[in-house]
């Protein structure tokens, strides 16, 4: 079947066809719809918005009340001997009602929709990339390792000691300047008797105090 579309205007068109095989039914099925959603729907009969029945003795029809500047998808079908139902389809575009009017849009609405979706997707990708970059920068500027109070802390190559560290160092220096005195072992068997040699070698605490020196440090011994 050959389909021809002629006399296309803003809101109408004339459709004519010629078939080599006769139609077994009493009429032809003329189905058409705007092609706005052709990407998302197939060429099914139930997806057509308009359907007209034309007697088989007629080979042309006038379509009216069409939308200006719109792409239409049209199919003609009839029951034949070789094929129960076969669709013959074509496409045509109505004229623009005011192509030279100021402010008129010559862009297809479907193309505008795809461009808008692409812009929104690009904006979302840019925002997501910015958030990931900020998170990566924060992770890079964090200290490599650190410890809490009582330990050494390192941040950006600088070593910081806790506040207790200088006090501990001063206490050790103070203890190093004091003499050591051995205390008797209380829990040992010979704890009651003191070694005379140890008593002779041990300095007199009173003499040290009279001499103005520092008092001796007494170190306890654990019991055996």
From Swiss-Prot:
Domain Fibronectin type-III residue range list: 1-101
InterPro entries reported in the protein's UniProt record: FN3_dom, FN3_sf, Ig-like_fold
Record membrane topology: Single-pass membrane protein
Basic and acidic residues biased stretches: 183-192
Compartment annotation: Membrane
GO cellular component entries: membrane
Keywords, alphabetical: Membrane, Transmembrane, Transmembrane helix
PROSITE patterns, per the entry: FN3
Transmembrane stretches, start-end: 113-133
Segments of this protein annotated with the region Disordered: 175-224
Entry-linked PANTHER family: FIBRONECTIN TYPE III DOMAIN-CONTAINING PROTEIN 9 (PTHR37361:SF2)
Protein name from the UniProt record: Fibronectin type III domain-containing protein 9
Top-level taxonomy: Eukaryota, Metazoa, Chordata, Craniata, Vertebrata
Protein's gene: FNDC9
